[in-house]
Swiss-Prot record:
<feature type="binding site" description="via carbamate group">
    <location>
        <position position="124"/>
    </location>
    <ligand>
        <name>Mg(2+)</name>
    </ligand>
</feature>
<feature type="binding site">
    <location>
        <position position="122"/>
    </location>
    <ligand>
        <name>[2Fe-2S] cluster</name>
    </ligand>
</feature>
<dbReference type="InterPro" id="IPR037237">
    <property type="entry name" value="IlvD/EDD_N"/>
</dbReference>
<dbReference type="InterPro" id="IPR000581">
    <property type="entry name" value="ILV_EDD_N"/>
</dbReference>
<dbReference type="InterPro" id="IPR042096">
    <property type="entry name" value="Dihydro-acid_dehy_C"/>
</dbReference>
<dbReference type="InterPro" id="IPR050165">
    <property type="entry name" value="DHAD_IlvD/Edd"/>
</dbReference>
<dbReference type="InterPro" id="IPR004404">
    <property type="entry name" value="DihydroxyA_deHydtase"/>
</dbReference>
<comment type="similarity">
    <text>Belongs to the IlvD/Edd family.</text>
</comment>
<comment type="function">
    <text>Functions in the biosynthesis of branched-chain amino acids. Catalyzes the dehydration of (2R,3R)-2,3-dihydroxy-3-methylpentanoate (2,3-dihydroxy-3-methylvalerate) into 2-oxo-3-methylpentanoate (2-oxo-3-methylvalerate) and of (2R)-2,3-dihydroxy-3-methylbutanoate (2,3-dihydroxyisovalerate) into 2-oxo-3-methylbutanoate (2-oxoisovalerate), the penultimate precursor to L-isoleucine and L-valine, respectively.</text>
</comment>
<feature type="binding site">
    <location>
        <position position="446"/>
    </location>
    <ligand>
        <name>Mg(2+)</name>
    </ligand>
</feature>
<comment type="pathway">
    <text>Amino-acid biosynthesis; L-isoleucine biosynthesis; L-isoleucine from 2-oxobutanoate: step 3/4.</text>
</comment>
<feature type="binding site">
    <location>
        <position position="49"/>
    </location>
    <ligand>
        <name>[2Fe-2S] cluster</name>
    </ligand>
</feature>
<keyword id="KW-0408">Iron</keyword>
<dbReference type="GO" id="GO:0051537">
    <property type="term" value="F:2 iron, 2 sulfur cluster binding"/>
</dbReference>
<dbReference type="InterPro" id="IPR056740">
    <property type="entry name" value="ILV_EDD_C"/>
</dbReference>
<dbReference type="GO" id="GO:0009099">
    <property type="term" value="P:L-valine biosynthetic process"/>
</dbReference>
<feature type="active site" description="Proton acceptor">
    <location>
        <position position="472"/>
    </location>
</feature>
Amino acid sequence: MNKLRSSAITQGVQRSPNRSMLRAVGFNDEDFNKPIVGVANGYSTITPCNMGLNKLALKAEESIKRSGGMPQMFGTITVSDGISMGTEGMKYSLVSREVIADSIETACNAQSMDGVLAIGGCDKNMPGAMIAIARMNIPSIFIYGGTIKPGKLHGEDLTVVSAFEAVGQLTAGKINEERLIQVEKNCIPGAGSCGGMFTANTMSAVIEVLGLSLPHSSTMAAEDLEKELSADKSAEILVSAIEKDIRPLDLMTKKAFENAISVIMAIGGSTNAVLHILAIANTAGIDININDFERIRQKVPVICDLKPSGKYVTVDLHKAGGIPQVMKILLNAGLIHGDCKNIEGKTISEYLQNIPDKPPTNQNVIRDIDDPLYKKGHLAILKGNLASEGSVAKISGVKNPVLTGPAKIFESEEDCLKSILNNDIKAGDVVVIRNEGPVGGPGMREMLAPTSAIVGQGLGEKVALITDGRFSGGTYGLVVGHIAPEAAVGGNIALIKQGDLITVDAVKQLIEVDLSDEELEKRKKDWVKPIQKYKRGILSKYSRIVSTSSLGAVTDL
């Protein structure tokens, strides 16, 4: 083992005061020569996503001790996207990714920790931890809190998105209030992250593919015993990685990120993965840009039938073989790199050796490569005079990927939702929600409430919604987010007017307003930068330093 980083606080006469503090928290003489391992615990009763994390943290803590390390547990925050959705509070969601990253980096570096085991559940926990891990480049592993099991109502599988869609169904007269309350009471049965292939499950899969969590661990149910056993094993593997000096940047290569993007396409993952992978890769110093997603999308089909646009939930994917089964299919098709390594020091080809070449025949969740749901990936990068830096469209399940219609413009999510629920949006409209970008929001809120209301009213195939904000992993339909440059910095989305004709063409990867360059230039001269209403606090600070979404909306470029 190399010299421990923690020797800076444990070794030598001059560190006697430091050791005295450590003795107070349980260190004995023999412990000062052991690696100090941080346990970044995202436990919280704010959200079901994180309420089961403490038992995993305690299990990992025991395993670290048993494996020859000294654990030091500390807390980090979470924000519940599902609870803050549709409110002012959602502006803090993406911001929390940076807070989580900063807090883990701060605690680990301040205490000279030799490694870190991060435990998270809700959406921003995963990328926040990965950004910190990439910054520090100390031996690290991530434990995902696990997915929630599906809610049940009259034999139907429910997720949290079912509740959002029920709101639109109620206002459209498709269901009564009794049904709404039944969905509300049954869609979230216990602990775990939202059950479809939404953002949390997508990002946990990304971490597994990058090699910083154990195979199969990203699709386990939060309440199952195997999740605790996986936490125990993860801690043991981390102590071994410290001894072998296996570091995150040894694993987070360009090929590894390309593998992650390929798997995202294959499983039908969240649009948020684009933003988060760009941010993690930036921190790791890897040249991944928004165009890489389009390049890989053209080659990799969607082979998993998962919610929100599909039929099944993540526990079904786990039973069908999980991410390793998906990876084996892609590996055999030459669509991922088999020489990338994981935290155990094994290559992908090595640890997939015993995974079947074909998906099980007794399931319909994972399809073989020659029988995909969609022949190309579902996350399309659209460009044009409304998004010169790019935008992200999720086109899985969309029967009509091309729409030209009049702009219905809203300056906030709240105004848009009110209009939808008043039945003001008609078939053929292009709904525009602007000033919701990283700077303009600030915080780039997710537009799950408006999109779910549109779907609930039966307009999901007949209306396009575009925004400089984000979408929840639970969103589907003809939606385009992450439009950059955003409205708040003078992007062309700020210049369009009610009724302007907008074309969204996911086939040609095009998003355009029917205006000449001369007209856009004329309007730009009349444009006035919005006044930032937040003068103090984290939203004010964030809006001043955050990058464009096409670079991952990061704060440390």
